């Protein structure tokens, strides 16, 4: 959680994104699935190898480590792809992997509908954007 917050502050303070941009991006990605699954289950559901690939390029910019975490490399080397081949951070049978895929898809549609029911207040969004611009000297 705090690593996420640190990166959010860095993006805003460095002028890469506004507070609204960061909040929207998290809400429209992280916020959709985090109440359904933790990060390891999510990678199982969405395809583990892609995360390793992105980590190779992204981690040097996020922290001092230039290494992909050993855990994900070991999982990828074992040919695990998550629910796609019923092998990932969690153990699956083919049937349980398909059930997880189906549940994830249903949840995704349900949570999107719920999120649309509670849009952010437009005045808050404009205020956040203005405050972020002032902080970065725009």
Segment roles from a protein language model:
Residues 13-14, 19-138:
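NAD(P)-dependent Rossmann-like dehydrogenase/reductase catalytic/cofactor-binding core
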Residues 1-7, 31:
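Structural/interface elements that position substrates and couple domains in central-metabolism enzymes
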